[in-house]
Amino acid sequence: MPISLGNAFIKNFLGKAPDWYKVAIIAFLIINPIVFFLINPFVAGWLLVAEFIFTLAMALKCYPLQPGGLLAIEAIAIGMTSPAQVKHELVANIEVLLLLVFMVAGIYFMKQLLLFIFTKILLGIRSKTLLSLAFCFAAAFLSAFLDALTVIAVVISVAVGFYSIYHKVASGNPIGDHDHTQDDTITELTRDDLENYRAFLRSLLMHAGVGTALGGVTTMVGEPQNLIIADQAGWLFGEFLIRMSPVTLPVFICGLITCALVEKLKVFGYGAKLPDNVRQILVDFDREERKTRTNQDVAKLWVQGIIAVWLIVALALHLAAVGLIGLSVIILATSFTGVIEEHSMGKAFEEALPFTALLAVFFSIVAVIIDQELFKPVIDAVLAVEDKGTQLALFYVANGLLSMVSDNVFVGTVYINEVKSALMEGLITREQFDLLAVAINTGTNLPSVATPNGQAAFLFLLTSALAPLIRLSYGRMVVMALPYTVVLAIVGLMGIMFFLEPATASFYDAGWIAPHTGDLTPVVSGGH
């Protein structure tokens, strides 16, 4: 029976999303203007943030771009923020957007090399605990020099490769032409293996994700907000590393211990081993690849290896904006591996562009947070505290809590600007400012692993094409991140309270760093 036109509109709205979800989004769209105009703009702002988090939490039911975008468009339409403020946010974050557009696509053209290296690691290390530590450590090391998003893009690219190899064989299809998103052709015997394999990949991805946070906090190029904080404090690479170390070193060590413990104890969804059948398939695949590898393929691997060296050097030395380095990777990799058709290049951009659009929506929510001054009460309360030690601990906690709901780049920027203003007005000393900058940096980077909205890398993982394949939902990510969240947050707080001041004083005495004197550059705008 054909449906009526009215029903057709309803059916088309948000497509296959469940009916209750559609009703919830429509309810949000009706409630927001009422709260904004009749009750309180501040309450409406927090309501919008909560609704946006809800759309992220339901990412597997419906990609957050559509519902989140509708909420953002309405927020701008009713005056919660302005298109100019949204544009200001986007312009201020142009580096992150360029990174997503070009760097993720650049990694796509390095796939053969990455699969080659990671297959060796995966098949070479039999112990799951050691393998998890290797993934966590490698992600941390890379994130200290590259951006966390780039590292996660690498890991996702590798995981999709592994997943599709097994899926093809289990479905009885030839390696060439196969759709790894469909499970219909898989037999019951292999279905258990597939579930275990999904759990295995999930745990490795989460270890790598947390690894990016462990490494990203240590250096000024690790995360975008680190650059902003270092810039405001006038620190260079070496000084940033040394000033952070009283907090970041204990956190890094405890993070790796946590990684080993959750695997050994098989808690919080960790501990799944690589099923033997799957290992055999990967071993066969590796052998087959080696047999059929021509000189042309070997040449491609060499070229990709050289480009990988260029990528790490260029990023570590900050030779250009991250996205532009990504563009150079695309140009070099495609030129020297012979990818010259437009349609075969287009595939590389499929993964990141929906997320880039989602991030633009995210920044419009950030614009609402700025215009409605949603974080102001928290910031004012913390700055009003007299005792310096308590102030440090509170800054860390407040940053951590806000970073869990909002983008850590935004939280870090807002806080460092407020502290800078306090310094300019003579409310705090330069010495206290330096300590607070450490508290802000570690506060935004460490506890924010709690939820995918805190870390852009986690959000990218959650909304990637891989997440539904390995059944990685928002809730599952929060549960799997929980042991790390607790350990990182508590050890970080201990570092701030007990190690930071004495260690900084001994660094001064040893002459590794010198106390800063004099004024700083004026404060940057409230954006980023």
Swiss-Prot record:
* Protein topology in the membrane: Multi-pass membrane protein
Q: Which coarse location class describes where this protein primarily resides?
A: membrane
Q: Name one GO molecular function term.
A: sodium:proton antiporter activity
Q: Which reaction does it catalyse?
A: 2 Na(+)(in) + 3 H(+)(out) = 2 Na(+)(out) + 3 H(+)(in)
Q: Which UniProt keywords apply?
A: Antiport, Cell inner membrane, Cell membrane, Ion transport, Membrane, Sodium, Sodium transport, Transmembrane, Transmembrane helix, Transport
Provide a GO CC annotation, any one.
plasma membrane
Q: Which domain of life is it from?
A: Bacteria
Q: How does activity depend on pH?
A: Optimum pH is 8.5. Activity is null at pH 7.0.
**Subcellular localization:** Cell inner membrane
User: Membrane spanning segments where?
Assistant: 23-43, 45-65, 90-110, 136-156, 204-224, 237-257, 305-325, 350-370, 392-412, 450-470, 479-499
Q: Which family does it belong to?
A: Belongs to the NhaB Na(+)/H(+) (TC 2.A.34) antiporter family.
User: Per its database record, what is this protein's job?
Assistant: Na(+)/H(+) antiporter that extrudes sodium in exchange for external protons. Can also transport lithium and potassium.
Descriptive protein name:
Na(+)/H(+) antiporter NhaB
Q: Which gene encodes it?
A: nhaB
